[in-house]
């Protein structure tokens, strides 16, 4: 492997990783984080009621609509709504949160379909959570690579944790790197911040010590010469590793690495 810096102080490296991992688990276990999700519902044109949300829900050309019964109310963008309320057309990978008592009702769109995802802080998956197991951090797994942009972003269709659902991402390029004497590559998608990247992958540990379907790695923006650092110590589980109520994307076929990435997060202890 080509590591970022062989002189990295292991104490500092470990402390920074531990702080990062605590933040990641804290967000996951937030009172309305993904561990609080109690259902994944797909509204249709025919109105229907869901057991963990108020009102009767439907969707159509104007977006998702809820009809709240007597005594039922939601708070949307700080405003109390009663009776009939239409949330409007939600963009792909967008969402709106409506507050219902101490719960939040997420209204979102994934793979071209509207969904309803209630989040209740008392959900057993959240209250029983003890933290995500992971490999011990090791600077050897902070691998230097090269980002090679495509002439134009390539629309890339991938599967999802929900059977029959598909996601489409623009892939701006690929990352080439070496591990165990082998040159490997990963198709990259855009990250959460401008210029940053994200890769979805599986490897030889998938289904053995790490979650079978996918892991994600967020990568800082490439340097002027295309240099990037893939710190596999920060390879994370997606929500689908913890719950069936997630629509997580699967890696593109070319991102199935033939080596064991013995770094990052492992299969969770808790799952519902």
Where on the chain are the PLM-derived regions?
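Broad, structure-driven detector of short, well-ordered beta-strand segments within folded domains
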Residues: 54-62, 103-109, 184-188
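Short strand-coil-strand connectors
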Residues: 51-53, 77, 99-101, 178-182, ...
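Acidic/His-leaning functional-site neighborhoods
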Residues: 176-223, 233
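Phosphate/adenylate-binding glycine loop and adjacent helical scaffold
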Residues: 79-105, 114
